[in-house]
Amino acid sequence: MTTTPVEITPRPETGQLVFKPARRGKPPLHLADFDMAGRKEFLRAAGYPAFRASQLSKHYFERFEADPAAMTDLPAGQREELVAKAMPPLLKTVRQLRADEGMTVKSVHRLFDNAMVESVLMRYDKRVTMCISSQAGCGMNCPFCATGQSGLTRNLSAAEIVDQVVQGVRALRDGAVGDPEEAPQRVSNIVFMGMGEALANYKATMGAVHRIIDPSPEGLGISARGLTMSTVGLVPGIRKFTLEKLPITLALSLHAPDDELRDELIPINTRWKVDEALDAARDYYDATGRRVSIEYALIRDINDQGWRADLLGEKLNKRGGGWVHVNPIPLNPTPGSKWTASRPGVEQNFVERLRAHGIPTTVRDTRGSDIDGACGQLATEA
């Protein structure tokens, strides 16, 4: 059997940004690429009755069914071909790693063209959070992030993004996450913090958002308030996202309050500076009423100085109060990285300095770091 060769994405040069990946083939169309009206037209164009769209949507978005034989409301002689047309397989899970006594599961998925993406499912006492990818790789080239250093392979389709969530829901239903004796839970929180800059793949990302939040059978019916959209500071994307006026949390990966350092840590800062990103984030709060999260990976002797905490506090307060929350994140280790997490005492001082400015600050939980499933570690090591 001949295997399609895997295309190796060249490692990006230092500071180089990639907004558009090299042209590749497109994934097969899936009903999750469309809203209900689009699904009806898609099936009609393929020679099937439009009402099949609602039946298929119930199987995918409500029952999370993948077996055509179980779809008994479809004609027996057409089930296989209908499912093949409207619900083609998009993700093949080739590896799973577990941590936190089975409560955290990282899945590595192979796409139709052998591109690889990862998602992470985290089960807590009263919620289930899923971290999903919007791109295979990432073009933002942040030097402390394994995903950024792998380069951008391609954008994901809306359906490839949604299917990560559906596969996570199936895993929960089947008792594959946590204690199988406990009652199954539904995914309640979705964070676009996996591989890729979601706002650089705007159309597919927003299509996925609507499939996630739209009520079933049009979508998964997950509350928009349970979603978080992360960005490194793609200001035009933030501005565009603001106009959607959805009650989704915006998370700005800042990592430095001064342009001199942020130019090195977050290369997109050479295009849109700290103040521009913070202004856009404040405007997002004004438009949506949703408090913005500032993500700040604490890197030993690089960005963890007390004066930087003070500068960050001053810049946030300059834009008013009550609109922002800071999440310091102990830097997660990545292969070949020269940087490490801040010392505990330095981390605590940074937090206390921010709180002294009246900034709500919470050190973020780093689930899955021992399976390379935490922030900045996703790099598809299959």
Curated annotation (Swiss-Prot):
Catalytic residue list: 118 (proton acceptor), 375 (s-methylcysteine intermediate)
The entry's keywords: 4Fe-4S, Cytoplasm, Disulfide bond, Iron, Iron-sulfur, Metal-binding, Methyltransferase, rRNA processing, S-adenosyl-L-methionine, Transferase, tRNA processing
EC primary class: transferase
GO molecular function, one term: 4 iron, 4 sulfur cluster binding
Coiled-coil annotated spans: none
Domain Radical SAM core per the UniProt entry, residue ranges: 124-370
Binding site residues for S-adenosyl-L-methionine: 196-197, 230, 253-255, 332
Location of the protein in the cell: Cytoplasm
Cofactor note: Binds 1 [4Fe-4S] cluster. The cluster is coordinated with 3 cysteines and an exchangeable S-adenosyl-L-methionine.
Catalytic reactions of this protein: adenosine(2503) in 23S rRNA + 2 reduced [2Fe-2S]-[ferredoxin] + 2 S-adenosyl-L-methionine = 2-methyladenosine(2503) in 23S rRNA + 5'-deoxyadenosine + L-methionine + 2 oxidized [2Fe-2S]-[ferredoxin] + S-adenosyl-L-homocysteine; adenosine(37) in tRNA + 2 reduced [2Fe-2S]-[ferredoxin] + 2 S-adenosyl-L-methionine = 2-methyladenosine(37) in tRNA + 5'-deoxyadenosine + L-methionine + 2 oxidized [2Fe-2S]-[ferredoxin] + S-adenosyl-L-homocysteine
Cysteines engaged in disulfide bonds, as pairs: 131-375
Pfam family, one: Radical_SAM
Domain of life: Bacteria
Cofactors named for this entry: [4Fe-4S] cluster
GO BP: rRNA base methylation; tRNA methylation
Known EC number: 2.1.1.192
UniProt xrefs under InterPro entries: Aldolase_TIM (IPR013785), Methyltransferase_A (IPR040072), RNA_MTrfase_RlmN (IPR027492), rRNA_lsu_MTrfase_RlmN/Cfr (IPR004383), rSAM (IPR007197)
Any further remark recorded for this protein: Reaction proceeds by a ping-pong mechanism involving intermediate methylation of a conserved cysteine residue.
Known role: Specifically methylates position 2 of adenine 2503 in 23S rRNA and position 2 of adenine 37 in tRNAs.
Name under which the protein is recorded: Probable dual-specificity RNA methyltransferase RlmN
Organism of this sequence: Kocuria rhizophila (strain ATCC 9341 / DSM 348 / NBRC 103217 / DC2201)
Gene: rlmN
